[in-house]
Amino acid sequence: RFSPDDYKNVVKNAERVYRERPEYWQKLLTDKIELMASVARKNRRPLVTTECWGLVDYKDWPLLKWDWIKDLCELGAITAARTGMWVGVATSNFCGPQFVGMWRDVEWHKRLTSIIRSSPIDASLMKNNEVAAKLLKRL
């Protein structure tokens, strides 16, 4: 699955495939986030996501564009944070500083971190919920 040919295929095609139908991919992402939030709300369980919001087979190769990746990651992080069910939200699968292409835009990370940190947690997670209380204590 993770051969160099796979990465070359992603580099060659992924952005084009996304840009041909961005609304489709964005709606697919937000619909799945809303579905997970709905299930979490029904079960009164908090969500934490560390690997998220888009493509995972992307490398920090020279000249790769990150704007479309960042657009999807921003949409995913903000959508998740607004549900109130996520108590831990990563900005992307590439949020580690080893991804130079992603970290060129430090302000993007700061802005998303601010949105995530200021998003309220759903009240259903706070009342009489031992599981959520234990997790939230650790955060």
Which residues does each PLM region occupy?
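Glycoside hydrolase catalytic-domain groove-lining segments
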Residues: R1-D57
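Aromatic-rich peripheral "rim/lid" segments of glycoside hydrolase catalytic domains that contact
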Residues: K59-L139
